[in-house]
Regions:
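Glycine-rich flexible loops
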Residues: 1-110
Length: 110
């Protein structure tokens, strides 16, 4: 998939997460694999409702910023671990759906 199309999809999914209430304020983050061991990711401290294609960052496989004005989000290391251990995974989304958060707060085992 082309980088511009991937950027558009990350923006679309960011806005969907926000619209559904699955992320609050600056919570949650998204990333996607692009060519040559690089990754697109959402910036830190940005509402998912306000994510824009030109505001996305490009990072290398260790999570170091290559392009973009903002800093990468703090959980990027988790995303990188997923990509390293699962080469078939093309994108990672970290959200906080209210029902999942409520279940986690109960301490019940799955």
């Amino acid at each position: 998939m082309s980088e511009p199309r991937l950027r558009a999809q990350l923006v679309d999914y960011s806005q969907r997460l926000h619209a559904r209430g699955w992320v609050a304020n600056h919570d949650g983050n998204l990333s996607a694999r692009i060519a040559d061991g690089r990754f697109l990711c959402t910036p830190t401290a940005t509402s998912k409702a306000e994510v824009s294609a030109d505001g996305l960052l490009i990072v290398d496989g260790s999570g170091q910023r290559i392009t973009g004005r903002s800093k990468p989000f703090g959980e990027l290391g988790l995303h990188m671990c997923v990509y390293k251990s699962r080469t078939d995974v093309q994108a990672v989304i970290h959200a906080h759906p209210p029902h999942a958060t409520a279940l986690a707060a109960t301490g019940l085992a799955l």
